Amino acid sequence: MLAGFGNGLADAAWNAWIGNMANPNEVLGFLHAFYGLGAVLSPLIATTMITKGSKLPWYTFYYVMIAMAVIELATSVTAFWRETGAVFLAANPRTNNTKDNRMKEALVRLPNARVTWLCALFLLGYVGIEVALGGWIVKFMLEVRDGEDFASGMTATGFWMGITVGRIILGFVTPRLGEKLAIAIYLPLTMALELIFWLVPQFYVSAVAVSFQGFFLGPLFPAAVVAATKLLPRHLHVSAIGFAAAFGGSGAAIFPFAVGAIAQAKGVQVLQPIILALLGVILGLWLCLPRIHKKQE
């Protein structure tokens, strides 16, 4: 719980900070691509440590995690040491005369609250889709597609690799199309791939489809952060993006649990219609956002 709390704070800070940089889609794409890369490499490293060679105890991987946490601490301190509250308030004065605190202004006062809540709900659904697919795809491939253990495990690796590559490559495409249009294209493509994954009962077709799903899902989180920075006044960026990222992160707990509970009763094949429905919901939420005007640097 404490680790999740700390990472949530750091996640919000990094997203808000980079979202205000020049070329934020590209830079955020690289930032979130490393998340996907970690999701690919960590299980492979942990499995190798436990099963190969000297077969180290399972808890040995926690030493690797501690080392990564030290690196995260060092980079965060270096980036934000001078970014005190006083510096932030001086650099981001209010653009109106309201006496509300910034969090209340972001969550309650229209029109800013509309953007904050739409982005938060969008990220809630997106993170739920990402983690539910990444977590349940192996079981689906084993039980429904009758895959071998190794090949089924590699489909999850392919999904996370798709997310990593998509965040890098599409991070350069998204700003040229505009965030609103780009995501309105990526999501229907993802839904089409989800239908192929669901309705074509071939192992390799499903494996390829889920990898490309990851590719088109990858840029959604960075694009939502960039959209929030363009639609909200600068003094609300940290409050609104921090809330949206934290609220969205709860999707990683809610939706995989819900899928698991339903799968327990109905079978893991329920994964596909649930994912398809969630994709439709977040597409609707995205289309409800106001028109995004080109950001003037």
Each language-model region and where it sits:
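Helix-loop-helix hairpin linking two adjacent transmembrane segments in secondary transporters
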Residues: 24, 30-90
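Helix-to-loop junctions at the C-terminal end of transmembrane segments
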Residues: 50, 166-179, 263-264
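A late C-terminal transmembrane helix in Major Facilitator Superfamily
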Residues: 231-270, 275
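Extracytoplasmic gate region of multi-pass secondary transporters
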Residues: 109-165
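Loop-to-transmembrane helix entry/capping segments in MFS-fold secondary transporters
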Residues: 19, 23-34, 149-150, 232-244, ...
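Juxtamembrane intracellular "pre-TM" segments in multi-pass secondary transporters
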Residues: 88-119
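Intracellular juxtamembrane helix-capping segments at the cytosolic ends
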Residues: 8-22, 219-233
